[in-house]
Every structure is written in structure tokens, then in C-alpha cells.
């Protein structure tokens, strides 16, 4: 049964069925990829868009909520056509072992292969949002990162894991660290110098705030780009002094990352946090 390929071996059959067949949300109906006509249509439609728009990567939303074997077959259609294209799956789960289950090439006990070259590290995001606000102890503060990276053995290709501070579904990182510039810079530094590769959400480069109470990313429009905007944060003159400080810091680290091959494919080494200092290379 394809239901058995849902990640939890202890889940009830009804839970597996609801996860696979139920709608993701009340206003987001699921498409039945087991229908061969729909499967072919979606495959052809995506290939058309890749060719038309010269797409160089795909993010598969809410991957585990699909019939994951059919989803794997669907992803494979793109990998057959574009073997060098990176395809990242949004697998929003709560442990590195669960995330690694969904990266292609993993030696899963049930034999499942997602065909996803890349997955998103939601657990690292959780640690980034929490660690800089906590006092150091066995399980909190900077030791969070040491424990997290110690589980990298679970990934078939840890260099192709996507790291991020925030996105459209979660609190802004600026909210998590209460706009503390030093904490914010530590988050940016870790994002751009750790194993894997970074995703930067629009506005993160200027410490953009969110709208309190909006559960989806606390979204503000990026200031600028339209005639009616009061200022243009795409320019130095249109940014505040604090925004320019964050922007310049982010740009400098991005240029450093671009010019440093070890950050692309080197082996990460970390040292146990001690006296408020966490060191890795």
C-alpha cells in the first residue's frame, strides 16, 4: 500500500489516509496525482514553464501531504528531462531524521526515494529563532546548533540542504530576535557560512519587520519599486542607517561566501560551545 510509505511506521491507517487524501487547508483543494491524465497534464505544464521562463530550480510545496510515491514519480519526470536542475522539497517536519527521509538517495527502511535532490532545514530555522534569546545550558542557547549539526550524518547530501532564517509562512527573523542588531547579524552570519546553501527571503537583507498577528510570514511589502511608495529601499538613500548597516553586512558576507570554495563544498567541523562561544569551520 502506498499509505505505508508515509514516514511514521506507528501511525494509524486512518491518519495515513487523512494525510494523503485530505485537503491541506479548507481553501486549498488537493489535486489527485494518482489520476494519470492529471499527472500527465501537471508534468507537461511544468516542463512548458521551465522551457518558457528558463526556470533553473523548483520548490515543491508541502511535499509530505501528497501521495508521496506519486509525488516522487512526478519529481522524477523533471529530473529525467533536466538532470542538473535543483528541486527542493518543503518538508516541514520536526527532526533532522525526518527531513533526511525526504532527501533522494537516503537508505530508508521502507525503500522510499523522494527523488528530491534538496530539502529545507526547518529544524535549523527553529534553533536560529530561539538560540540567541536563551541562556546557555545543555539543551538551550548555542548548544542547540552543536546538537543539530551532529545529526548531519542522516543526510545523503548535506551540502544540498537549504537553510533559511524566515519565509512567507513564519515569523520574520527580526521578530524572533526583537530587532536586536547584534543577534540579527549572528543569524545572518550563520546562514551564510554554515553547511548547505542559503535562501534569503525578500526584506531579510534590511531587517524588514512583519505585521503582528499575521500568521503567514508577517508580510509587509518591500518599500520601493512603485511610484506611490514613500521611499525606495532598493537604494542606499532610501534605506535607514540601520537598514544600510544590515544590508552592507549581508552583502559583504554574500561576497565572501561567493569567493570561498570551502563554504560551497568543504567539510564542516564544529567545537562544543564553551563560555558563550560556539566555533565552527
Regions found by a protein language model. Give the residues of each.
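Active-site-proximal helices and loops of the catalytic beta/alpha 8
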Residues: 45-47, 51-156, 161, 179-180, ...
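Short, solvent-exposed loop/turn elements at beta->coil junctions and helix N-caps
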Residues: 267-277
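Substrate-binding cleft of secreted/luminal carbohydrate-active enzymes
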Residues: 188-209
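Substrate-binding/active-site clefts of carbohydrate-active enzymes
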Residues: 1-53, 71-82, 97-98, 115
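Conserved interdomain hinge at the start of the Helicase C-terminal
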Residues: 182-186
Amino acid at each position: 500500500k502506498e499509505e505505508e510509505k508515509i514516514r511514521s511506521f506507528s501511525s494509524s491507517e486512518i491518519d495515513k489516509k487523512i494525510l494523503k487524501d485530505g485537503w491541506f487547508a479548507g481553501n486549498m483543494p488537493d489535486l489527485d496525482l494518482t489520476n494519470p491524465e492529471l499527472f500527465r497534464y501537471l508534468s507537461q505544464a511544468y516542463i512548458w514553464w521551465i522551457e518558457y521562463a528558463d526556470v533553473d530550480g523548483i520548490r515543491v510545496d508541502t511535499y509530505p501531504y501528497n501521495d508521496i510515491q506519486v509525488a516522487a514519480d512526478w519529481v522524477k519526470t523533471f529530473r529525467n528531462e533536466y538532470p542538473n536542475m535543483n528541486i527542493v522539497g518543503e518538508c516541514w517536519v520536526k527532526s533532522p531524521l525526518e527531513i533526511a527521509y525526504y532527501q533522494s538517495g537516503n537508505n530508508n527502511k521502507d525503500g522510499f526515494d523522494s527523488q528530491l535532490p534538496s530539502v529545507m532545514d526547518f529544524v535549523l530555522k527553529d534553533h536560529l529563532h530561539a538560540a540567541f534569546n536563551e541562556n546557555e545550558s545543555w539543551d538551550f542557547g548555542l548548544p542547540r546548533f552543536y546538537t543539530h549539526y551532529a545529526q548531519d550524518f542522516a543526510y545523503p547530501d548535506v551540502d544540498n540542504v537549504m537553510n533559511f532564517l524566515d519565509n512567507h509562512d513564519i515569523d520574520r527573523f527580526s521578530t524572533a530576535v526583537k530587532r536586536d542588531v547584534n543577534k540579527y547579524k549572528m543569524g545572518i552570519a550563520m546562514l551564510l557560512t554554515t553547511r548547505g546553501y542559503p535562501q534569503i527571503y525578500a526584506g531579510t537583507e534590511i531587517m524588514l519587520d512583519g505585521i503582528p498577528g499575521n500568521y503567514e510570514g508577517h508580510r509587509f511589502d518591500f518599500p520601493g519599486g512603485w511610484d506611490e511608495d514613500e521611499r525606495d529601499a532598493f537604494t542606499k538613500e532610501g534605506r535607514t542607517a540601520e537598514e544600510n548597516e544590515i544590508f552592507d553586512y549581508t552583502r559583504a558576507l554574500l561576497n565572501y561566501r561567493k569567493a570561498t570554495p570551502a563554504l560551497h563544498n568543504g567539510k564542516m567541523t564544529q567545537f562544543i560551545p564553551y563560555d558563550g562561544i560556539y566555533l565552527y569551520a
